Design a protein with these regions (language model features):
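Anionic coordination/interaction segments
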Residues: 1-127, 131-141, 145, 151, ...
Length: 235
């Protein structure tokens, strides 16, 4: 595992990402690269029944509570994968393009936002491990002034690109906390909107955006829906 996997702005713990991404110096949309050894381990993890159930529970929760936004994620990822068959989803039928495993042994995040994710999009956070959630490991949403007990096995969806979040420390060195984080980089949607090319290539070819930034944001917020719409869609 490289130095960047254990020293990063989100916390003092090992973390490894897998999936489809664009940004951070990439020239085009692609699969995150790993050594053959790490790739084999990640493949085994992603193919395990337990991990597939955990990941797809988060995906199905996303579909249930944010159906329009989920469709946008899923349709964009489908378009990317159809255009480039080399792209590989982490989990079949899952709308999230990428996942990060926070490996701990005490994965306690610093205050941060995931500013490269889709601004109005959702990030699924699932806590794992063995710790007392009444005494530590809480999820803190700073902008909402909320401290949430977050036991192992809990999943939450938050707009992590714009909402500052972190974790409370664990109280015992014998406790362990890990996490599965699922998300999609904003650059993927920008790439698709630019006709599956970079913004620079799009503009050089005389491309004109169908919407202004303000219009795009309004459209994005409209995908979140409201409580009355959620109730009306359920029996």
């Amino acid at each position: 595992m490289s130095k960047s996997h254990v020293q990063h702005r989100r916390g003092n713990f090992a973390a490894v990402a897998s999936g489809i991404s664009f940004g951070g110096g990439q020239q085009r949309v692609g699969n995150l690269a790993h050594s053959p050894y790490n790739a084999a381990i990640l493949d085994a993890v992603k193919q395990s029944t337990a991990m597939r159930r955990i990941a797809n529970f988060a995906n199905n929760s996303f579909r249930l509570f944010f159906s329009k936004l989920h469709h946008f994620y899923d349709a964009t990822l489908d378009a990317l994968c159809s255009r480039d068959p080399s792209l590989q989803r982490n989990f079949t039928g899952n709308a999230f393009a990428c996942a990060t495993w926070n490996l701990g042994p005490q994965a306690i995040s610093y205050v941060h936002t995931d500013h490269l994710n889709l601004p109005w999009g959702m990030c699924a956070i699932t806590a794992l491990g063995d710790f007392d959630p009444t005494r530590g490991g809480h999820l803190i949403l700073w902008d909402l002034h909320l401290i949430i007990e977050f036991p192992p096995g809990t999943t939450i969806l938050i707009p992590s690109a714009i909402l500052r979040h972190s974790n409370a420390p664990l109280v015992s060195p014998n406790e362990h906390r890990y996490a599965l984080i699922q998300y999609s980089a904003g650059g993927l949607f920008r790439w698709a909107e630019c006709g599956h090319q970079t913004q620079k290539q799009f503009r050089s070819a005389g491309g004109v955006y169908a919407q202004t930034g303000r219009q795009r944001w309004k459209r994005g917020v409209g995908m979140l829906g409201i409580w009355d719409e959620l109730k009306a869609s359920r029996p």
